Amino acid sequence: MWIPTEHEKYGVVIASFRGTVPYGLSLEIGDTVQILEKCDGWYRGFALKNPNIKGIFPSSYVHLKNACVKNKGQFEMVIPTEDSVITEMTSTLRDWGTMWKQLYVRNEGDLFHRLWHIMNEILDLRRQVLVGHLTHDRMKDVKRHITARLDWGNEQLGLDLVPRKEYAMVDPEDISITELYRLMEHRHRKKDTPVQASSHHLFVQMKSLMCSNLGEELEVIFSLFDSKENRPISERFFLRLNRNGLPKAPDKPERHCSLFVDLGSSELRKDIYITVHIIRIGRMGAGEKKNACSVQYRRPFGCAVLSIADLLTGETKDDLVLKVYMCNTESEWYQIHENIIKKLNARYNLTGSNAGLAVSLQLLHGDIEQIRREYSSVFSHGVSITRKLGFSDIIMPGEMRNDLYITVERGEFEKGGKSVARNVEVTMFIVDSNGQPLKDFISFGSGEPPASEYHSFVLYHNNSPRWSELLKLPIPVDKFRGSHIRFEFRHCSTKEKGEKKLFGFSFVPLMQEDGRTLPDGTHELIVHKCEENTNLQDTTRYLKLPFSKVIFLGNNNQTMKATKESFWITSFLCSTKLTQNGDMLDLLKWRTHPDKITGCLSKLKEIDGSEIVKFLQDTLDTLFGILDENSQKYGSKVFDSLVHIINLLQDSKFHHFKPVMDTYIESHFAGALAYRDLIKVLKWYVDRITEAERQEHIQEVLKAQEYIFKYIVQSRRLFSLATGGQNEEEFRCCIQELLMSVRFFLSQESKGTGALSQSQAVFLSSFPAVYSELLKLFDVREVANLVQDTLGSLPTIMHVDDSLQAIKLQCIGKTVESQLYTNPDSRYILLPVVLHHLHIHLQEQKDLIMCARILSNVFCLIKKNSSEKSVLEEIDVIVASLLDILLRTILEITSRPQASSSAMRLQFQDVTGEFVACLLSLLRQMTDRHYQQLLNSFSTKEELRDFLLQIFTVFRILIRPEMFPKDWTVMRLVANNVIITTVLYLSDALRKNFLNENFDYKIWDSYFYLAVIFINQLCLQLEMFTPSKKKKVLEKYGDMRVTMGCEIFSMWQNLGEHKLHFIPALIGPFLEVTLIPQPDLRNVMIPIFHDMMDWEQRRSGNFKQVEAKLIDKLDSLMSEGKGDETYRELFNSIIPLFGPYPSLLKKIERETWRESGVSLIATVTRLMERLLDYRDCMKIGEVDGKKIGCTVSLLNFYKTELNKEEMYIRYIHKLYDLHLKAQNFTEAAYTLLLYDELLEWSDRPLREFLTYPMQTEWQRKEHLHLTIIQNFDRGKCWENGIILCRKIAEQYESYYDYRNLSKMRMMEASLYDKIMDQQRLEPEFFRVGFYGKKFPFFLRNKEFVCRGHDYERLEAFQQRMLNEFPHAIAMQHANQPDETIFQAEAQYLQIYAVTPIPESQEVLQREGVPDNIKSFYKVNHIWKFRYDRPFHKGAKDKENEFKSLWVERTSLYLVQSLPGISRWFEVEKREVVEMSPLENAIEVLENKNQQLKTLISQCQTRQMQNINPLTMCLNGVIDAAVNGGVSRYQEAFFVKDYILSHPEDGEKIARLRELMLEQAQILEFGLAVHEKFVPQDMRPLHKKLVDQFFVMKSSFGIQEFPACIQASPVHFPNGSPRVCRNSAPASMSPDGTRVIPRRSPLSYPAVNRYSSSSLSSQASAEVSNITGQSESSDEVFNMQPSPSTSSLSSTHSASPNVTSSAPSSARASPLLSDKHKHSRENSCLSPRDRPCSAIYPTPVEPSQRMLFNHIGDGALPRSDPNLSAPEKAVNPTPSSWSLDSGKEAKNMSDSGKLISPPVPPRPTQTASPARHTTSVSPSPAGRSPLKGSVQSFTPSPVEYNSPGLSSNSPVLSGSYSSGISSLSRCSTSETSGFENQANEQSVPVPVPVPVPVPVPSFSGSEEPVRKESKTPPPYSVYERTLRRPVPLPHSLSIPVTSEPPALPPKPLAARSSHLENGTRRTEPGPRPRPLPRKVSQL
């Protein structure tokens, strides 16, 4: 039976449990579990990491831990009762673990490794804490390290700042908010501004001396030197080096490294230097022989200097090499370091070029104990300590020092009867009172043990030597008296014996007879002469002699012979026990000299403070002893001396001696009667404050009042103890009188000088310190009343000095911080006074920082004592006194401008944060009763309204992101909890007082605005938190967003009809709330939109405002990253609210607006789909197809469905930027054209918008044109750039702006040059299908055609797509996927290459048009693409597989042509047809014939550098050894069985026969051309081909071609053999008449096409000038199955996605035209190395017209590109295939016309061209040999651009939604008198007829500029009849106050729209393509 657990509540899993048993809970080792129940060795509970899943697990798998349970029962919470630091470490490491792995994923390697080390270090420290064997100090140290590392890691990972108290986390509920703020602020400040250490230390380590001439031992002496004061500031660090320049004792680190300690900040200056003096130990002269002298001398060697400035910039451990300078003149040795510092080192030599002193230096900061801990490794090995000279900046009590520093300065000696000066050495001894030398009390420096004697270095031949060597003598105090120092002087001989001869001595006693030590300073000692054998051991013999010249001269002792020799030393005593001051000694011995007491007390102020604190206790005993002796006589003097000593301890240098005085007062003070004299004298001074002129001394007294009161209180206590409490009332009266005097002087106002206010300030500064002393003698209430009266006596007039006001407030602050205030009884007495002064200061906005600090302390105390009843009353007082002023203060300080300086800004933030914390503390402490009293306190509704507005405004300020640092989440959550609690209280007041007739819009709007920004706070978005953090927040506060959302809904429902005031203003804010991914919040808020729509419908009959606001706000919000897929679905769920059973509003008639409501929601939902896709795509770093496609989708949606033109323009520019970033310059130009189309050439002013300045519409359109042209240029789309150049040139021309017109014409010319000169790569096109539900909405289950990048083939494109969609699966087949793929929760990509089908064939079929021009039209403006799949139908014939080889042809039609505003567009329609084997054969032959013609033509015109391609092509067709050649087609389709079984294929069989004959004719001519150009080594192959050709021709039954179509032996520039069609065996017309069109084989037309009025087709009446009609310019013969002749083989590479289906090609691409619709495009062969396609023609029209051949003039009939085949037969044109001479005949269509380049003319009028037109120009029935002026079938580019020209463009239709009309894509058929009305499927729509321009004609002898007319590009930009009816967005336009100036007339003559023969062209009707297109879709 399961029993709830009592104690087993919390445990850690010690072994993983799989949970395979029923109801088992899977656990991993290390998981923590909360246990709910137990049963027979099993527990039931849950893992804390996933509390929603409960289950059972074995009890043996869990280690139980102690825990406390809060809120026992169903919602109990278990907290482990372990060290809080351990708990924090555990939870933090878990959070870090997840984030640490993410660092690796994000490739943040540096932080990854650093965090790994820190985590390991924390784990090690955690083990140490858990073991529990650490000492208290060590545990504290470990916790400090742990928290420091936790804080570092949290900061690096962007986690929250953790508030801590003594290394433990604090619960915000357990402390006041003000205290929480202080903890956070302290940790934040500590993090931002590291504490500056007051103490610094320099670590020095000697490495080696590098010098070439070593060989003697050296002494190296380091010291710190102040170059500013020219003195050393530290002791010396002394070390010895061996002969190699290395430390002599390497095993003793303390001998070669030292720490210069206690350097104050004043010592860290640039003029502090490290000086190094090097002394050698050896011979007198460096060059002497080794054995010359056995005696060793100390001799100067060198000096080095280093400035400490290099160390101030940063800590360095790098080794430094110091230059060592040698002294040339030994007499200057004492100042060599000064000269080097002064840069006077030119007089010194370096010890060597490579010489130097290698040292390591490091500057350390902090207390010496802290340094010992942090650098324990250094101290554990040993390091010597080098002190400062003298005391440190701060003298600590108990510090014992007794160091006498002696500097051996210099000497003056006589020659001693010698011709040269002496070599003097000084030896020093310390001799005690018994005449015995003191052992080991002479220190040369740290690092060297003390010695018993000292030997100076020797200066060679110098009678005035200067040594300046510093020595320390650490002599014990008890050895000082009677001891002296003896200096012995010896001459050092340089002879072989090297003996040292004594010639004199000096001495100096350490202490005088009166007990004073040797005074500091320089002393000139007498040198007493003596002999070598003089016995100096008997000190009594010389101690009677004078030792100093000063004493000697003073005594005027004539008995002693005067001496010229002297010796100077400098002494400095650093002692805590001995003194050199006689006045101090006189005071301490006052009883022996009672007559000197007055003088001694007066001189006390002149004694150095360090001397006084050394004898502090003795001095105080002396003073109170004198007071007891005669208080009447010495009372005032003793009082003044006491004041001086007390104030002396205020100095920072002696501050640490205050505890010494406190100890004295408590333990040693015995003046039981002193309180009377102290009170008396103190009152005397206070009474005279108001009268005294000079108050400096009085202020000194007031400053010392704290310790005076301590003495008074202690004295009274001693008296009470001694007398049993006598005179108590008398004492109380004295204190009362004293404080009354104080209150009187405090109440006085300062007059004139302000000295009184200064005295008041001094008193107030120290008065709070008296409280604790008074409490020792008086009751708490008594003291509180005394303090209240004293503080209440302060003047409240605000014109008092600001300094006094500040001091007064500081006094209030100290009062609040005092022990007195912590008592509830006293606090209730003092609180009104405190609040009164605070109110005054806050009202004047003065001393805000101090006010905030005081308030913080007040609330800290209230929180600590919140359980007491008195606290509620205190809250009442504070609310009544401060709440209003506190709100106003916060509003005031937050509205101030930010300070410029960082310090002021930091101060501003501090004071703001403290006031905010105070307000929050007050509100949190308020109960229902307090809120009720507060609301009832307002007498009028206006006051309540002002208060509510004020507090709502403050709340909005409090939740600003910048209010607290970003990592203060704890503080933010506490603040939000207080705010929402307060709002819930205040919302009732809002409902009760401001509804119905009292409705106030402003206060309700403020409320809703506050609620919205509250919910939207970043710190409340729990979804962004880690699971553990989210769990903690929910457990403590719940989801405050939902609470506030419910409150919003409730308040909204209370508004009633007043809701209309907030529509549509609140739509945006509420929408922002609903975008938060919190289901409960969304469920509450989304129905409000339904309510808004309902009320808006009631008011205005529609909800357009709601709709507009929703859409506008949705875009901006979702762009900011808000909203998700779930929100879209939830928002869509509003639709059921419009059903027959609504859930909210039941009275409205739903049917009136249900439909529009559903439509709105559906529209918004679709917009969200696109916005979500857009946002997700924008998160990707690089620009890819997804980003661009998504932007296009959103752009189109704004235009077509929402008609939001401003948003449309914004997304145009976003798309433009994406294209530029991806270097899609062509697409960028098309994109910008969308905006260009919305503008007109007008002078309407436009506002600033995006990056555009304020300018006119004309200027902006000009700028756009130039930008677009530039992008077309960069994208190598020069043809489109030419059109825009012409358009903008028209504008320049109309304004007579010839300068810019010239530039534009030159730009246009440069584009023509680029077309002809630069190479352009033809891109591949790929069809991509996106299947599956995991794709974005704009791609899901759709298919697109994509334009590939340069050089990008199928494999590369497929890999790129898979990289963009890494989770997608590539489908390996080209079949249509089934429904399961469409609905799959996955991503499937289907990719294969497709062939572009150019819509306009006119340029492609023109003879003589360069390939550079044609290549553009093959792959631009493409709407249709094709893909062929071969298959066998029926039984497959093994002998001839072509009999059953069918082709499935798929045609894809796009919504827009490529290229366009994107590199890919969606497939709008797909058509699938099957091509029969016969149709396939026809297409293959047509393609091969076309290929042959092209190669022959290129060879003739020498475009081909190499004849090999032609050779291979001829060889492949004639010698078809692979698949059998065309004979396989004969076997398959010309046999009787096939003809009888397929009677419907008669025409097709005839066509196939005709193509075979045509191929033979082309081959014959090709061989003739080949023979002319074939190189000699290829002649045998050529001969073989000729022989095989005759065999092949005979197989066709052809002996010779008819005379009229024989191949010409003469070479023509564009020549090709003519085609004979009368050799076809089948009759092609009902009457049996054979129509034979005369044409060049290179302009061979296919049979005529049926005209189609389909909106998506090109002019069906067009026929090709190059080959039969083809739907692809690329795939010419891709359908070639493997096993037949090579006559159809191709050199082109085949498409990889189809199999072979033509007789001779190894690769295949099925390419036949549709069977169900008529083909609309004509194309030519593509020069690209890619699969080419054949063309499937439609059947020939039965009624053919006769062709009248006129051989004589060499002209063959010319095809008009706009006529069907039979119509083209009537107009013969010159042909290069004629049998005439090489002269090319003039085309009749060129007669009478100017010839222009192949670009469209600049239109002067706009038109709306139609698909079909009827020509009004009759055509002659026959060809006349005379050259006359005949109407051209191809309009000239110079005359008016007929619709036939402009309509061929696939770019000229536009979206009518844009408000801009444009031409539809169409083509015009200009016939020659014969109409094929049977083919027409639509009636032309009449439109206005343009007037033609008169065209000059040429006479018969005149030649036009060009030999033949060229067809311009089949499109024209900017041809439109109507300007845009949709105006520009209002936000972008400026109202025009006056009409713009009229445009000047154009300089060009008006162009006539009449034709030359007087007839008028019939304007074509519009071609009704389903989606009209725009200029931007060029």
From Swiss-Prot:
BP term (GO), one: positive regulation of vascular associated smooth muscle cell migration
Chief location of this protein within or outside the cell: membrane
Chain residue ranges for the region called Disordered: 1657-1738, 1751-1978
Membrane listed as a keyword: yes
CDD domains given in the database record: C2_Dock-B, DHR2_DOCK4, SH3_DOCK4_B
Location in the cell: Cell membrane; Cytoplasm, Cytosol
Motif (SH3-binding): 1797-1803
Superkingdom to which the source organism belongs: Eukaryota
Coiled coil: none
Modified residues (Phosphothreonine): T193
Domain DOCKER: 1199-1605
UniProt xrefs under Gene3D superfamilies: 1.20.58.740, 1.25.40.410, C2 domain, Dedicator of cytokinesis N-terminal subdomain, SH3 Domains
Protein family: Belongs to the DOCK family.
Oligomeric form and interacting partners: Interacts with nucleotide-free Rap1; functions as a guanine nucleotide exchange factor (GEF) for Rap1. Interacts (via DOCKER domain) with RAC1; functions as a guanine nucleotide exchange factor (GEF) for RAC1. Interacts with the SH3 domain of CRK. Interacts with FASLG. Interacts with ELMO2 and EPHA2; mediates activation of RAC1 by EPHA2. Interacts with USH1C (via PDZ 1 domain).
Record note on domains: The DOCKER domain mediates interaction with small GTPases like RAC1 and is required for their activation.
Name by which UniProt lists this protein: Dedicator of cytokinesis protein 4
Naturally occurring in which organism (per UniProt): Mus musculus (Mouse)
Recorded name of the encoding gene: Dock4
